[in-house]
């Protein structure tokens, strides 16, 4: 039996990859890349400890001890984007939490999977003055995870340098989480790394979605219903957070436009967590598109 324990935030929880729950009238749930990867492991026993909104410190405090009790053969730690929006953002504290989490899992004998987050410059359009501080923080978190991965010898997927990660089909309608295709990409990349490292694996996940991606009408329907509430939430948390970061950088004299690309960069924050948007409704309406 292969015990696979998945720690992290909503990316690992599977948000963006809806599946039907068992039983008549049951509400749809999430699958995600960890479940897809588990299918390619020998006799898998999957435990997803990831939670919505988790930061690095949350993973260390709330998920690590339970993960160690499960004595994992394979463990994943994919986290970081929620950290970027915190007012008390500190690369040193993130490095401490992530280092302790990954180091503890490695010391327990687990093969640990980690990931560099994609470049936050693709989907979510905000002015460059707000885009740059978030891009800078994401870059700092990737540097932290690079150091942690090198120190402990993790299997480290560089999603930031993966061209396929920037295909619009890889993202759900909210543009904040991977779509089923995106989750399959992550699962395939980790599967390939495990195979290359000599870990016994079965067939890799199919790159093609098993569910019909939502069509244009389905996306418009989501925007007209669930999307309206989403816009309101984003207007009262994401935008003020980005404005606050921009103001702090300006006051501290650290705002350097040249360091994070040209003004007007488009942002995509795939790991940013939001309340349950009932995205599965998109799958149900896919045939309408």
Question: Which ranges hold each PLM region?
Answer:
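Substrate-gating cap/lid alpha-helix
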Residues: 122-159, 180
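Alpha-helical scaffolding segments of alpha/beta enzyme cores, especially the outer helices
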Residues: 93-96, 100-107, 140-147
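Short glycine-enriched, charge-decorated loop/helix-capping segments at active-site entrances
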Residues: 19-27, 89-92, 128-134, 172-173
């Amino acid at each position: 039996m292969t015990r696979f324990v998945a720690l992290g935030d909503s990316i690992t929880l599977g948000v963006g990859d809806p599946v039907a729950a068992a039983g008549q009238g049951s509400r749809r749930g999430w699958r995600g890349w960890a479940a897809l990867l588990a299918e390619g492991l020998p006799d898998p026993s999957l435990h997803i400890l990831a939670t919505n909104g988790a930061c690095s410190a949350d993973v260390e405090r709330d998920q690590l001890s339970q993960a160690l009790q499960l004595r994992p053969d394979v463990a994943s730690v994919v986290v970081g984007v929620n950290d970027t929006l915190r007012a008390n953002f500190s690369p040193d504290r993130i490095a401490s939490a992530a280092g302790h989490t990954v180091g503890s899992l490695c010391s327990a004998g687990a093969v640990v999977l980690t990931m560099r987050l994609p470049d936050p410059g693709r989907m979510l359009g905000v002015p460059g003055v707000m885009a740059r501080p978030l891009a800078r923080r994401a870059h700092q978190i990737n540097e932290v995870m690079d150091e942690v991965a090198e120190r402990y010898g993790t299997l480290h997927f560089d999603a930031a340098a993966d061209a396929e990660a920037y295909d619009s089909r890889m993202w759900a309608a909210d543009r904040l989480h991977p779509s089923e295709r995106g989750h399959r990409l992550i699962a395939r990349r980790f599967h390939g790394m495990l195979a290359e490292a000599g870990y016994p694996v079965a067939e890799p996940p199919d790159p093609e979605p098993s569910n019909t991606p939502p069509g244009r009408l389905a996306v418009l329907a989501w925007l007209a219903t669930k999307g309206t509430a989403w816009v309101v939430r984003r207007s009262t948390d994401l935008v003020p957070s980005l404005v606050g970061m921009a103001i702090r950088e300006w006051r501290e004299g650290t705002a350097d436009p040249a360091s994070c690309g040209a003004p007007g960069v488009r942002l995509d924050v795939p790991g940013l967590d939001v309340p349950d948007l009932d995205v599965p409704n998109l799958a149900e309406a896919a045939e309408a598109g």
